Amino acid sequence: ESSNKRENQKQIVDKHNALRRSVRPTARNMLQMEWNSNAAQNAKRFADRCTFAHSPPHLRTVGIFSC
């Protein structure tokens, strides 16, 4: 799977961070995103279900992080 390869993960993270840096107005305290394997696995589980909808909030929590 392509998202498991470090090079692809780096491209995803770099692009995401570049897009976040380009927001206007700029954020005062926007943290840089890092790859999180647990979050990636969680996203893949949801994507594998192939539904066109947002996941419920309780499924968007990985460790102490939620989105």
From Swiss-Prot:
Cellular localisation:
Secreted
- Top-level taxon in the UniProt lineage: Eukaryota
Tissues expressed in: Expressed by the venom gland.
Give the UniProt entry's GO cellular component terms. extracellular region
Q: Where is this protein chiefly located?
A: secreted
Q: Per UniProt, which keywords does this protein have?
A: Calcium channel impairing toxin, Disulfide bond, Ion channel impairing toxin, Neurotoxin, Secreted, Toxin
Q: Which is one GO molecular function term here?
A: calcium channel regulator activity
Pfam families, alphabetically?
A: CAP
Q: Does the keyword Disulfide bond apply?
A: yes
- UniProt PTM comment: Contains 8 disulfide bonds.
Presence of keyword Cell division: no
Q: Which residues form the SCP domain?
A: 13-58
What does this protein's UniProt record list under function? Blocks contraction of smooth muscle elicited by high potassium-induced depolarization, but does not block caffeine-stimulated contraction. May target voltage-gated calcium channels on smooth muscle.
User: Which family does the record assign?
Assistant: Belongs to the CRISP family.
What protein does this entry describe?
A: Cysteine-rich venom protein bucarin
